[in-house]
From Swiss-Prot:
Protein name (Swiss-Prot/TrEMBL): tRNA N6-adenosine threonylcarbamoyltransferase
Function: Required for the formation of a threonylcarbamoyl group on adenosine at position 37 (t(6)A37) in tRNAs that read codons beginning with adenine. Is involved in the transfer of the threonylcarbamoyl moiety of threonylcarbamoyl-AMP (TC-AMP) to the N6 group of A37, together with TsaE and TsaB. TsaD likely plays a direct catalytic role in this reaction.
Binding site for Fe cation: 111, 115, 300
Binding site for substrate: 134-138, 167, 180, 272
CDD domains: ASKHA_NBD_TsaD-like
Gene: tsaD
Leading EC class: transferase
Cofactor binding mode and count: Binds 1 Fe(2+) ion per subunit.
Length: 337
């Protein structure tokens, strides 16, 4: 079975073709980072217009990369939410139109389920059950996963997501959008211990997160200590250490609560090298395992949508003729496969 995956939930146009026997056959990605950089963040209208320009050409490129024709595609999967409504509608409309024209099933995919399943694309995929840490610019969640669609929300951010906090703090440090990866690079030059940031909500029970206060703490630290290069690097180091420690503490609690031995990390922030190293060290000490996707599959991409679509199609998750998207869509509302 060959599934064409279409991802247009935010500012990346991702197209991929996944074969359930031969794996990933094609992967095309276009990033709108340069388009939105001057605005310091994603402009929804511009994102939608760029998806309109790029989606069909990338589909053509993916089919060519795979050495296939349209007749070789068995289903079309598209991101139906959550995300920016205009951006979602582009991918959903194209996906439904192609499925109708090719007379194949159309499969709506939950964006965060795509992220959650992205590590399944690797050579050593995780087995159920596991705790999933979904950490990105829009979400920070801990989820108990016992099977496809069997998701229990254990905790989530009550304000800013971790990735959003990274980008906002990077902006305070004078870094360009998207600032999260640049902040991490700057943090590598910082001196540990010069500044100490709080570890929000770790002094109380529970698995929820709060990262908005770290941005305020960073702003005050910058104001009081200047903006020379070393000071900025030291602040970046302190901020990153605080976020990583907080995520690690909450992951440890979630593993203790569930009794699971496997941790899956997914979403854009899961590409952070410091976070990967710290969680790998923690899981080794616990006698468990940590799983994550390769860096290019941590951010938004079509491969995860094609794979998730294949899984859902096998569970009879085909859509009707209507084009429906859900900008807000709790992962817990998905049916079990």
């Amino acid at each position: 079975m060959r599934v064409l995956g279409i991802e247009t939930s935010c500012d990346e146009t991702g197209i991929a073709i996944y074969d359930d026997e031969n794996g990933l056959l094609a992967n095309q990605l276009y990033s709108q980072v340069k388009l939105h950089a001057d605005y310091g963040g994603v402009v929804p209208e511009l994102a939608s217009r760029d998806h309109v320009r790029k989606t069909v050409p990338l589909i053509q490129a993916a089919i060519k990369e795979a050495g296939l024709t349209a007749k070789d595609i068995d289903a079309v999967a598209y991101t139906a939410g959550p995300g920016l409504v205009g951006a979602l509608l582009v991918g959903a409309t194209v996906g439904r139109a192609l499925a109708f024209a090719w007379d194949v099933p159309a499969v709506p995919v939950h964006h965060m389920e795509g992220h959650l399943l992205a590590p399944m694309l690797e050579d050593n995929p995780p087995e159920f059950p596991f705790v999933a840490l979904l950490v990105s610019g829009g979400h920070t969640q801990l989820i108990s996963v016992t099977g496809i669609g069997q998701y229990e929300l254990l905790g989530e951010s009550i304000d800013d997501a971790a990735g959003e906090a990274f980008d906002k703090t990077a902006k305070l440090l004078g870094l360009d959008y998207p600032g999260g990866p640049m902040l991490s690079k700057m943090a590598a030059q910082g001196t540990a211990g010069r500044f100490t940031f709080p570890r929000p909500m770790t002094d109380r029970p529970g698995l929820d997160f709060s990262f908005s206060g770290l941005k305020t703490f960073a702003a005050n630290t910058i104001r009081d200590n200047g903006t020379d290069d070393q000071t900025r690097a030291d602040i970046a180091r302190a901020f990153e250490d605080a976020v990583v420690d907080t995520l690690m503490i909450k992951c440890r609690r979630a593993l203790d609560q569930t009794g699971f031995k496997r941790l899956v990390m997914a979403g854009g922030v899961s590409a952070n090298r410091t976070l990967r190293a710290r969680l790998a060290e923690m899981m080794q000490k616990r006698g468990g395992e940590v799983f994550y996707a390769r860096p290019e599959f941590c951010t938004d991409n079509g491969a995860m949508i094609a794979y998730a679509g294949m899984v859902r199609l096998k569970a009879k998750g085909e859509a009707g003729l209507g084009v429906t998207v859900r900008p807000r869509w709790p992962l817990s509302e998905l049916p079990a496969a």
